Amino acid sequence: MSDYFSSRPSQTLTPMGNKPSGGGGGDDASSIHSKSSQYLMDILPDSMTLNESVSSIVANNQAKEFILPETDERSPYFINVPIPKAQPTSTTETKKPLAGDEAIDGQFVKEYPTDILVDRFYKWKKILKGLVIYLREVAYAQEQFARINYQLKGSVKFPFLTDIDETTNTITDPFTTAPRGPKKAQPAQKKVGLTDSEQFQMQMQQEQQENAVQAPTDESKMSLAPHEYKPVQTTESDNTSAASGFVKFGSGSIQDIQVILKKYHLSLANQQFKISKEITSTVIPKLEELRKDLRYKITEIKDLHGDFKTNIGAHIQLTSQLLKKYIAAVKFMNAHGIGNDRASPTNKKPHKLDPKHDPYLLKLQLDLQLKRQVAEETYLQEAFINLQSSGLQLEKIIYTKIQHALLRYSALIDSEARLMIKNMCQELQHGIISKPPAFEWDNFVTQHPSCLLNWKSNDPIPPPRKVSDVIYPHMKSPLAKCIKAGYFLKKSELLPTYHQGYFVLTSNYIHEFQSSDFYNLSSSTPNSTKSSAYSSSVSIADTYANANNAKANNHHRQASDVHNSSTTTGGTAGANGIRGIRKKSYLAPIMSIPLNDCTLKDASSTKFVLVGKPTLNENADVRKSSSSTYLSGSSQASLPKYGHETAKIFSKAPFHKFLKGSKPKNKNTKSSELDQFYAAAQKESNNYVTWTFKIVSPEPSEEELKHFKRWVQDLKNLTSFNDTKDRIKFIEDRVMKSHRFKAGHMSRNSVNIGSHTPCLTDSTFTLQDGTTTSVNLKGRAEKPQYIHIQNNSLADFDGNGFRSKVNTPAIDDYGNLITVERRPAQSPHQYSDYMATSGNTTPSYSSGSRPQSMYNGYNPAVSITSNGMMLQQSTANNNTNPTTNLRHQRNISQTSSLPGFSYTSLSLPVNSPGSSNSESSSGGYFAIPLHGNNNNNNYTQRNSEGSSPCYNDDQIRQQQQPLQMQPLSRTSSSSVNVTAMRSTSAGNSITANAPVVPKVMVNNQNVKTVAADQSATAPSSPTMNSSVTTINRESPYQTLKKTNSTGNVPCLTAEKTHAHPAFYKRGNNSAQNLTTSSSTASRVHPIRKHKKNVSFSSLNSLMFSKKGANHGGNLMTNQFMSGGIQEDDGDSTNNDTIKLNQSIYS
């Protein structure tokens, strides 16, 4: 930089004190101040200089008489350069900066050209020093950031997800790649031609191995060994799943998270290392070099201090005197000419003009002085120009160097920031953040059809298969229909004492069973809550069985052993979660009376007499089975008033097991009685016997008597046939005709279910005598013409459709016996509280097989049958619609879930009970009950603070409403309990003006689901009305909307949110922001502090990449502006290598 300042001008001006080389004795000063020129000075006025306030026009007019002011550029007194003030020599040395370039604080800078510039460039020097110190710290910090990011990369441990190899940057699958042991660090001198990233990674690996000894044991325990996880077997055609079971890599699934995080930290560590090396090796050295040069330039500026010493002031004073003398000489000549020595009247002091005062000579002297003055002024001006031009160039160089350093620094920091957004934010936004929450689950379910249902999150809950859906040969045969079933007391000629039995009337037989639970396969153990009255009634049989166990024949003992083993096996399997299958069916009746060999001999209001040939079950222990229901005269009084309770009290175990009685009997007495009973039963077998049947209740009611009368009528009609084919044809034809002809009449005159109890043969539709029929009567009298079944109110009756539904299958989905009649006969004590079913289906608990204790004290309002879920109505219920069917309400915990919107639709499938819509699932897998509430008796409305009321299906109606956005929080602990129901039967109607779901509270916020003028009250009873509608749970998740913003993480914002102070607020509102409770404590990991005195040898020993910097030349290159980001990573030829700075989705 030697060209910063030019040397002093070569020409030299004549000093002001030298005499001119031309003639003339003495200098100008001596000639001016001589006494011989005093006569000229007396002619001049006191001031010849014009006032500065005179305008330029006046100055031009008076320029011939007066001198222009010194501010005018044409004035001889004008100076166009500032005149430096000379400093005393005594103080100059004391105020001179010290050798150590330390400025004196608390004083102003001297107003001298060189001093002011020295001070300015000294400050620039300090700025450069501070900038170098800052950048050196930045380089150190970036190196430490790179180390931290490399350590963070090592903390990303997902042993079963796709990984990235640290050395080759290739994608590896832990289940398909053979595990490799830890690589040993190779000596640095053996590695030739390594890139900066490889050297840095190798150095980081060495440091991690050194720090592994000092690592806390907690972190080592967090790592999981790869052998603890096994790959998931997928189908051969599956190309969407990885070995871990998640969606394959590159699909935006969780499978990508390990590669994204490791790639992010690895690329960021490499970039930070490049930034540190770039600052240390390029930016800082240039600033240090500039600062060193500036030190020399400050010294050169100080050497120009003498160039600003001048006597321009003395020149101006001399010019002023010569100018005045010249003007006086000109005026003297104009007034007197040359003049003379004689006095005259006009010239009292005569004086002759001295020749040396000739105006020419004076003007020549004045011009020479002006020339010297201008030369001095020019010299001073050139000194200023030299100093200022050099200072300008120097400051421009300093400023440009600082600009380039800061520009490079900002480009490096910008590249780091863009790398964060590119390799982290955008990768996550294009990947897992943009996927729906059930993305992984749907793929997981579809890839395992052998062990999971093919049920996606957006699909409705698959309906369970009903027994009525099963098809098998002759499933609708009239031979397999149950006409009636109920309890009676029976005695015969050989058994004069009445005993109770459960009798089933079919198309061909009258079967006697121990109890109404004879078909219940799930009953295997006695109920511990049986009443003592029934226990006492069978105590004789139980004692006899225990006393004579050794006398039992081998056949009976083997049958008992087989059945006991099957029961034990079934119980053990049930304990293991698998339902056992019985090896031997115990549905064989105790006794069967064929209708072909049976005749109704006599009948009264409470009794009827049958004559027939019974058939005993060969595989059953007749003695034990019969004695189980044997009632002595003394024990008959202890019969319960309600015979229907037998289903709850009699054992569900096989027939050879009996309940122990509460009153001990004499052993010999009981043995004789049972021996007599057994002998009588053997005599009755295959012989014509006369039985007497009567009502169980000792004091039957009017309704019981009517029911008994229908039994008598049906027996009379059916026993009139002695051929099975004729009887079956008769039953089927009369059933079809009854429903065909009476469908219209019954639709117009609906019968009140609470006051009328229809059965197989109603009083108005009994077998008529004397009518013609096409059936071959075979000589038997009083053969019926048709049997009428109470039909439903369908106006258009379809015989084939009805035929496909009647009495198929034999038991309903609830495990109850199905009869042909509208509701089966049951124990008389149940009539007052009986709740009839609607339609052509059988009610639940017709035989007393389902104890009411299961329902916490109230009768269930819905029964499940093969034709659907039916409503049961009480006699007190005035809302009677015999054709309205309801879904089944299970006795399970109420669903606690989120409110959704419903559409009016009859054809949409309905989800399973106990669940409601969860977010983004539309009633799919995520509609899982969150909270349980087994108390069905208290259907009360919850407190409005943070809770929502319970609903019952009789108050839930569908209305088509516009979609509204509702505030919602995933951390909600309260939700809406909706009673789930199954699909209804065909023919249901929607109540258009029914009330809708009321306003609820979610997270202490109002959720508006209905209009302002609509309201509904919470039900106080779980009993359902007959008119209900389907809750549509297939509507999409309508409480949140997705807001996309450029460059930001997608947000989920809630509309009309009135947040409670405790309401959880989410920063990004992501779908997918998985929220945590505010009370959840954040996990704090120990952080190792980096020592400040770490050596920079690791940076100085590594060469910067040839692509990372531009040494010399133009700094504005593409590499410079890109901040050092290498898109190809120097590895563009290897297709198997992942690019650290490129998206995995590109």
Curated annotation (Swiss-Prot):
The keyword Cytoplasm applies. Keywords: Cytoplasm, Phosphoprotein. SMART domains: PH. Its main location: cytoplasm. It is found in: Cytoplasm. The modification Phosphoserine is found at residues 344, 793, 944, 969, 1070, 1095, 1098. This is Activator of SKN7 protein 10. It comes from Saccharomyces cerevisiae (strain ATCC 204508 / S288c). Positive regulator of FPS1 glycerol channel required for the glycerol efflux. As a component of the RNA polymerase II holoenzyme, is required for SSN8 destruction in response to oxidative stress but not heat shock. Required for cell survival in response to heat shock independent of SSN8. GO terms for biological process: actin cytoskeleton organization; cellular response to oxidative stress; positive regulation of glycerol transport; protein catabolic process. The modification Phosphothreonine is found at residues 808, 1017. Component of the RNA polymerase II holoenzyme. Interacts with RPO21 and SSN8.
